[in-house]
Amino acid sequence: MENKKVIVGISGGVDSSVSALLLKQQGYDVTGVFMKNWEEDDTDEFCSAEQDIADAQAVCDSIGIPFKKINFAAEYWDNVFEHFLIEYKAGRTPNPDILCNKEIKFKAFLSYVHLLGGDYIATGHYARTRVLEDGSVQLVKGLDDNKDQTYFLYTLGQEQLRQTIFPIGNIEKSKVREIAKENNLVTFDKKDSTGICFIGERKFKEFLSKFLPAQKGEIHDENGIKIGMHDGLMYYTIGQRQGLGIGGVKDRPEVPWFAAKKDLENNVLIAVQGHDHPLLFKQSLQAIELSWVAGMAPADKFRCAAKVRYRQKDQSCEVEVNQDGSVNVTFDQPQRAITPGQSVVFYIDDVCLGGGVII
């Protein structure tokens, strides 16, 4: 550890602030780096980004470590945002946070860390690593199960994990805030960021319409009867209730409507009534673009647990790896609102095995 150089990604939030502090206390040579991944185009977003930079700088000054800024906006646009638009255009619902970790934080940033002569990269993710006797590294859930972020990190491989430290992986979120307060870090009571990093808190629909022309179409029930109009399939996600705009439909009970399926060919959104409507449930899925943390799948066929969305409880399933590398996943219990474009992530106990993109 003595004089090992760690470059920590400082976002201006409490998690990365405490990560930097703990590394400094543990005797590492620490530098904080703020990654700018998006060029803001509206005043509110700009002010919020400026505040994050100011907070990141203040934290580094307070801890007594150097602070740097790096602009990855071009890389982000090319490798994350354009993919995001392609997916939405195809009617899928991508997860840009997963792609951002893969392409920016643990690729572009990692290369930059090497340029700075860093031995390790560190982030404020709630995750852990475990080194096995054979030298391989496991990606392990964060101690705070409620905050575990391995779902977003499943694309990381051995090479990246060997060079990564997750300083708060062994700590509960409440304790992280406590540490920040005790050490007078300005971010101690800053609320957690929500929303996609490049949209922040602003209205998603409004944002997306700037980049993709929407094509309005009809909403049908499961029997093909028209019950309303949609603003563009890309604005809806499977299982969504809000914003469907289906009012009282003649001769139908006053039960909420949910988006169940997208018929891309005919530009039709299929909606059903009731949170637990059978059409919202599936017992199996197929996924592509698999990433295995160990470098390969545990076996051609194996049992494990899986999540089809962040913070979902682990669901028991069987995974079968196909010749082309894709997987078929069969769950013990039917799963609600499995969404194409989102990721399915696999676990055995607290170990994240990897995952793929649902089709």
Curated annotation (Swiss-Prot):
Its EC number is 2.8.1.13. The active site is at residues 100, 197. It is found in: Cytoplasm. ATP binds at residues 9-16, 35, 124. The record marks 125, 342 as: Interaction with tRNA. Residues 95-97 are annotated as: Interaction with target base in tRNA. GO terms for molecular function: ATP binding; tRNA binding; tRNA-uridine 2-sulfurtransferase activity. GO terms for cellular component: cytoplasm. The keyword RNA-binding applies. Transmembrane segments: none annotated. Residues 147-149, 309-310 are annotated as: Interaction with tRNA. It catalyses: S-sulfanyl-L-cysteinyl-[protein] + uridine(34) in tRNA + AH2 + ATP = 2-thiouridine(34) in tRNA + L-cysteinyl-[protein] + A + AMP + diphosphate + H(+). InterPro entries: MnmA-like, MnmA-like_C, MnmA-like_central, MnmA-like_central_sf, Rossmann-like_a/b/a_fold. The keyword Secreted does not apply. Pfam families: tRNA_Me_trans, tRNA_Me_trans_C, tRNA_Me_trans_M. Keywords: ATP-binding, Cytoplasm, Disulfide bond, Nucleotide-binding, RNA-binding, Transferase, tRNA processing, tRNA-binding. One of its GO terms (biological process) is tRNA wobble position uridine thiolation. Catalyzes the 2-thiolation of uridine at the wobble position (U34) of tRNA, leading to the formation of s(2)U34. Belongs to the MnmA/TRMU family. PANTHER family: MITOCHONDRIAL TRNA-SPECIFIC 2-THIOURIDYLASE 1, TRNA 5-METHYLAMINOMETHYL-2-THIOURIDYLATE -METHYLTRANSFERASE. NCBIfam families: PRK00143.1, trmU. This is tRNA-specific 2-thiouridylase MnmA. It comes from Francisella tularensis subsp. novicida (strain U112).
